[in-house]
A protein has these predicted regions:
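Helix-to-loop junctions at the C-terminal end of transmembrane segments
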Residues: 85-96, 282-296, 381
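C-terminal membrane-cytosol helix-exit motif in multi-pass small-molecule transporters
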Residues: 194-213, 403-408
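Juxtamembrane intracellular "pre-TM" segments in multi-pass secondary transporters
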Residues: 20-31, 208-239, 422
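Conserved MFS/SLC helix-loop-helix module at the cytosolic interface between two early adjacent transmembrane helices
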Residues: 84-120
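C-terminal transmembrane helical hairpin of 12-TM major facilitator-type secondary transporters
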Residues: 297-342
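Structural signature of the two symmetry-related core transmembrane helices
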Residues: 100-114, 193, 298-313
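Cytoplasmic helix-loop-helix junction between adjacent transmembrane helices
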Residues: 128-166
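Residue-level signature of mid-helix packing/kink "hotspots" within the transmembrane helices
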Residues: 79-87, 169-170, 276-284, 370-371
Length: 422
């Protein structure tokens, strides 16, 4: 759940991983920057996550919502406009400053949310989702975090983001079905717009400015082609594309499958919440192992294979609620580890002056993945059945697994971003 964008968590609680990940301590300003920017991600992702578990079911009440393909496109079109605009927003934040670009994007996101809330049919909701995606701030926020902390504590800062997004996801799964029953999907979209406006206030009045040293670093820009075509970054971009495509694809299938099994949509959180908690509880050991043993890429590759097996099992074991709950728990372990690892690697490999551009490309591929996953997931499920969706997801994971070979282990956090170990 994407976001977006997201990073590490904990063994039993998010703070335990933060304490274990590095001996370096954050300064008060670094803590303020990290927590406040993590809250921006959380507020924005709350508006996206709260829709995800229920939209495929409740969209059927809208004119045009009886088509699984249209429902999938509506879920995923947010990712298409995000993908088209992440690079312009990232580059603009490199040159115009992070805060103005983030505020502008949040306002666009809020307008799209209110438009979707007013939608009388699937097409208006689709247009609202498209406008939501035009507020493409993920790259700018992630770059702002990397600007605001020393590289020694970058993993901790990204961990705060990941923990906030993960907890937001869990909360969304818990409250989404009852709120939908109370207010309807339009009420959820209104809540999404309000959360974006609250995030604007946080950016304006809470987030500290980036240190002057980070501003000075932006004077030395590399050719955009060198950044976009960097082989290390390309491998990571392929990964985030696949990861978010499969995420959206399975959430086109699973909610309707649970309804088919006679589990009312307002009770779907019974399945989702334990799965997310299990993913939280078990994701930290591989993250800590990867950092301590300088085996981040090896852990990433193992988790790609882990998810590939999970999708094959999904195709064969999706005939009971308990099987779905168990496999979702397995999925979220792998998803959380990979979601935590990828943006951290991009931030450490990308040159500081072009971090916004690099993260813009990264978030572009992430959000195009959201669109492709939603659109293809709906179409494949409609024409070939839900099992086919999981086989396609497994195939996509295998392609990612193959592309990950050649990815170099990143420098330890006490080295400069952009340095890799040969």
């Amino acid at each position: 759940m994407s976001a977006s964008a997201a990073d590490a968590q904990t063994i039993a609680h998010p703070k335990s991983f933060l304490m274990a990940s590095s001996a370096a301590h954050m300064t008060p300003q670094e803590r303020t920057s990290s927590f406040s920017l993590a809250s921006i991600f959380a507020l924005r992702m709350f508006g996206l996550f709260i829709i995800l578990p229920v939209f495929a079911v409740y969209a059927r009440e809208l004119p045009g919502g009886d088509s699984e393909t249209l429902v999938g496109i509506t879920l995923g079109i947010y990712g298409l406009t995000q993908g088209l605009l992440q690079i312009p927003f990232g580059v603009a934040s490199d040159r115009l400053g992070r805060k103005p670009v983030i505020i502008f994007g949040l306002i666009i996101f809020a307008l799209g949310s209110f438009l979707a809330a007013s939608g009388a049919n699937i097409w208006i909701v689709m247009l609202g989702r498209m406008l939501q995606g035009a507020g493409a701030i993920s790259a700018a926020v992630t770059a702002f975090i990397a600007d605001s902390v020393r590289v020694q504590v970058l993993t901790k800062a990204m961990a705060m983001v990941g923990a906030s997004i993960g907890l937001t996801f869990a909360l969304s799964l818990l409250i989404s079905p009852p709120l939908t029953k109370l207010w309807g999907v339009s009420g959820l979209f209104t809540l999404t717009g309000i959360s974006a406006l609250i995030a604007v206030l946080v950016v304006k009045f809470v987030v500290p400015p980036a240190p002057q040293s980070a501003i000075d670093e932006k004077n030395e820009h590399r050719s955009w082609r060198k950044v976009v075509c960097d082989p290390q970054l390309v491998r990571l971009n392929i990964g985030i594309f696949v990861l978010h495509a499969v995420l959206t694809a399975i959430f086109v299938v699973i909610p309707t499958r649970l309804v088919y099994m006679r589990l009312p949509s307002e009770h779907h959180w019974w399945v989702y919440l334990p799965a997310v908690i299990a993913g939280f509880a078990l994701m930290a050991p591989p993250l800590i192992f990867g950092e301590k043993k300088q085996a981040v890429v090896r852990v990433m590759r193992f988790m790609i294979g882990f998810l590939t097996v999970a999708f094959v099992l999904f195709a064969y074991l999706i005939h009971s609620i308990w099987e779905i709950a168990f496999l979702l728990g397995i999925f979220f372990i792998g998803f959380n580890v990979l979601e935590a690892t990828l943006p951290n690697l991009v931030s450490r490999i990308a040159p500081a002056a072009d971090r916004g551009l690099a993260l813009g490309v990264y978030n572009t591929t992430q959000n195009i993945g959201l669109f492709v996953g939603g659109a293809l997931g709906g179409a494949i499920s409609q024409h070939f059945g839900p099992e086919a969706v999981f086989f396609v997801c497994a195939s996509a994971m295998l392609i990612w697994f193959a592309s990950s070979f050649g990815l170099q282990e990143p420098a330890r956090p006490n080295r400069e971003p952009g340095e890799v170990i040969k």
